[in-house]
Amino acid sequence: NTYPPYNISKIDDSTYRISIALAGFETNDIDIILEKDILTIKSSGKKKNISENFLYKGIAFRAFEKKFQLADNIKIKEATLKNGLLNIDLLKILPKEVKKEIINIIEK
């Protein structure tokens, strides 16, 4: 399923972005759900405006569901909708340095 189109980009060493083209959608038309390590972006479609009389209708407002599997060390930083583009910024949490522990040997 290729609708809606999306990109995944690397912003820097610890930040990634999923960008989804959602022209005409508003924030209340979109659900973003994180359950365990599965990120789901979905919509039941935009409410139809009966008063509009299209001569040509090329912008789709249909229902969709996109799922992305995230690694354990990926957290969602924020989601923004601007100019028809939904951006979900992901933050890669780097594991803390493992402390070196010296074990003393006891002579018996």
Question: Model features per residue range: what roles?
Answer:
Residues N1-K108:
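Alpha-crystallin/small heat shock protein
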